[in-house]
């Protein structure tokens, strides 16, 4: 793992660079689900299974981009009393193994204050921040705070993002550019859209940093197809959160369930 003196942006760059000739694998997990210690165990299982980075969600009451599986896990975490403080505690422990990119909606971020939030995130050892509902027009202050704290503010683009907007967003990307593979919310889908290669080529033409794909990737075959379409990184969320939720409901170990899936996904990217 990169030394703790590196900035978060540098740790993310190192994680992508350490995956030569293949796409980096970034599992998404819900912070504080099933509880803080449980989410740390899941994050450590991801590291053991071959993940390169981890995306850690902050549970929120009105998550616009989350599909039903991730929304339900976030609701359970909130009902169990998980707070942002607890998620940052989990981030600090997972960050000892892998770079952690926090996914947080704008409301908790703005309520806490942008500079304070960025400082707390950096102090926890996190490497980056994704704010899915942060408008480009309001991103300036957040990006300045993240830059000052050494954090990568990772923007999202969609297949429907027009060229002029892509040209405005991509050069400001830090760490990586998050490309949403489909229009809509997160969730499992039957396959990788045939148009993905074109979407990725357009993104990579404008992006100074690696381009990662998320939303709708749930199998090793999907992951391999996204990589073949040109993705520098592959983000898998709903499938892993569903496995963790099913394990909790069944009284089995969610960390083991996620480990087995991440190992299979990592294998799909290492073929």
Summary of predicted features, one role per range:
Residues 1-26, 91, 201:
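N-terminal amphipathic alpha-helix/helix-capping segment at the start of soluble metabolic enzymes
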Residues 3, 11, 42, 47-49, ...:
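Active-site beta->alpha loop and helix N-cap motifs at the rims of alpha/beta catalytic domains
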Residues 20-26, 95-105, 146-157, 204-215:
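Short beta-strand/loop segments at the ligand-binding rim of alpha/beta enzyme cores
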Residues 36-47, 161-171, 213, 217-234:
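Catalytic cores of alpha/beta
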Residues 52-63, 124-130, 135-138, 177-187, ...:
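Glycine-rich phosphate-binding active-site loops on the catalytic face of alpha/beta enzymes
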